[in-house]
């Protein structure tokens, strides 16, 4: 009886820890809302800059759509990685990978860490662990997330008008993300297909 009581108490504590108060939720969403206005370098097929929020949403959709290829992966964890991966840009804006310096990365990491630590538990601890796992890129989920993150950007460039590309992107469309897909034949094939689409787009001139 006593053991059962202890288990019930432990469950009650966990439920209390996991509760995010309504006001804190609204404040947290207000930070995330900034990503709707934070534009990325790439354009959409409609001719406007895409937002960080749009990139993150489609990245999460990609993760879901390819999940059958990785039955051993934890889809819930993978989706969380995709959803939170660019929240740091709510504080700094998006800086293209080819322009981002180590100082930029350090500033973003510091601001993000401060914000994450302001969240209630277990969200602060879970997000801290997820960011560390994503940075290490040793787990299957982290590898899938990073490969798709790069590939989503490449696909978006293929969907934009060639007139919006800057000179260095002609090479980046051939090489960007190549080092992130070797863990999976599926990801390698997907990257190859996107590269062929880029070549066809360049040849067509549109």
Give the residues covered by each predicted segment.
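Active-site helical microenvironments for divalent-metal-assisted chemistry
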Residues: 14-206
């Amino acid at each position: 009886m006593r053991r059962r009581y202890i288990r019930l108490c432990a469950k009650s504590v966990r439920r209390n820890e996991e509760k995010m108060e309504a006001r804190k939720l609204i404040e947290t969403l207000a930070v995330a809302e900034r990503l709707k206005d934070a534009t990325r370098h790439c354009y959409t097929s409609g001719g406007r800059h895409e937002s960080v929020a749009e990139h993150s949403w489609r990245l999460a959709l990609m993760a879901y759509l390819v999940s059958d290829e990785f039955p051993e992966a934890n889809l819930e964890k993978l989706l969380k990685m995709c959803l939170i991966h660019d929240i740091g840009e709510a504080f700094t804006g998006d800086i293209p990978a080819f322009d981002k310096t180590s100082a930029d990365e350090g500033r973003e990491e510091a601001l993000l860490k401060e914000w994450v630590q302001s969240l209630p538990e277990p969200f602060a601890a879970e997000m801290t662990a997820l960011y560390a796992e994503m940075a290490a890129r040793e787990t299957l989920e982290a590898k899938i997330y990073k490969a798709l993150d790069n590939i989503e950007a490449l696909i978006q460039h293929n969907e934009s008008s060639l007139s919006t590309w800057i000179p260095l992107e002609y090479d980046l469309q051939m090489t960007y993300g190549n080092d992130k897909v070797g863990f999976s034949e599926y990801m390698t094939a997907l990257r190859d297909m996107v590269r062929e689409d880029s070549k066809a787009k360049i040849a067509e001139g549109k």
